[in-house]
Each structure stands twice: as structure tokens, then as C-alpha cells.
Amino acid sequence: MADSNALEGLTQALRKLPGVGVKSAARMAFHLLQHDKPGALQIARALEHAVNSVRHCTLCNTLTEQEVCATCANPQRDRSKLCVVETPADQAALERTLAYRGLYFVLMGKLSPLDGIGPNDIGLQKLFDRVVPRDEHGEPLPPASREVQEVILATNFTAEGEATAHVIAQALKSRGVQVTRLARGVPVGSELEYVDLGTIAHALVDRR
């Protein structure tokens, strides 16, 4: 690495991106500083703007610049269906299929006891309160009076994703909620954002 604290700092910052190792980070840093300084400044400005402007939707947790995201605010969406995903990237993958017109809840993660990630870290209580709201006396509304009639579990088909889906399903079924899971057309061990759109669409249609 060249004798530059600034260059080293940029390289270390780029390494924070998923899948970027030492060599890739150094290559990107050299390219930006040697060949594309205007592009580097554009990236810096865009990143700063996004960090300062983007927040979590108060209803579904996805990333948005508004208090409520465009999907949750859209009156044309089917509010009786709620699809639970791990990340905004998974939500985007489902949206691209054009096969789903309901609403979403983004966990922003998955259960992983080995990493110290438990139910409170991924907002499970917020999900349960969304699906099974309570009346003015603090009692759960009966199934027929709830807005959400079906919860579709679209967590990834990894060990952690399956465990997360199982915990959510058990909790919601005990509250009288209809819970379905994406069909097994999605390969085991895969993440939704990397699965082709046709496969995701079929998994949605064939959910059970």
C-alpha cells in the first residue's frame, strides 16, 4: 500500500462493504483516486445524503426517506396480506416479480443465537403487534376483526432463515393467524435477492 494515511483509511472503509476484501478494496481506492476523482466525490456526496436522509418506515421497517414508505402508503395494496422478509433487498426482489400486491414487514435481520441476535434484535414484538393489534382494553382483536388475514413468511432458506420462520409461525399460529411459507422452489441455502424472479414468483403462488 502506498505511504498515505488517507488512502489507507479509504481502503479500510471500502472493506466494510459485503464481499470486499483487502485486494478489491485497494483496487477500488486506487481507481477512484487515480482515474475518477469526480466519481469519487459523487459517491461521497450521495452516501452522505443517503445516510442523513434515509430512515426506517414506521410501519414496515424498510428503508425510506418518508415516515411511511410508498408501499405502506399505497391504498391499492392488499392490506390483508403481510409478507415477512429479512432485508429491504429481499423486499425489492419480491417487488420485481410483480406477483405480490400485499404489504411487507422487514425484519432487518434473522435470528442467530451464535451471533447474539435474538427476537428483540429483529423486531418480532413489533411484528406481532402489527398482525394482532389490541383493543382499548388491551385484549387481542379476534381474527375476523384484524386487518392482516395472512402472513407470508419469505425469510431466506438458510438455517437461520428457516429458524426465524419457524419461531414466527409458531407464535402467530398460536394467536389464530393464517401463516404460509414460500414454496420449496427456492433453493435451500439461498437468499432471495440472488434468486431469479421467475422462481420467486412461482414460490409465492405455490406458498402453503
Curated annotation (Swiss-Prot):
It comes from the Bacteria. GO terms for biological process: DNA recombination; DNA repair. Gene3D superfamilies: 3.40.1360.10, 6.10.250.240, RecR Domain 1 (1.10.8.420). Signal peptide: none annotated. GO terms for molecular function: DNA binding; zinc ion binding. PROSITE patterns: TOPRIM. A zinc finger (C4-type) spans 57-72. It holds the Pfam family RecR_ZnF. Keywords: DNA damage, DNA recombination, DNA repair, Metal-binding, Zinc, Zinc-finger. InterPro entries: DNA_Rcmb_RecR, Rcmb_RecR, Rcmb_RecR_Znf, TOPRIM_dom, TOPRIM_RecR. Residues 80-187 form the Toprim domain. May play a role in DNA repair. It seems to be involved in an RecBC-independent recombinational process of DNA repair. It may act with RecF and RecO. Belongs to the RecR family. This is Recombination protein RecR. It comes from Polaromonas sp. (strain JS666 / ATCC BAA-500). The gene is recR.
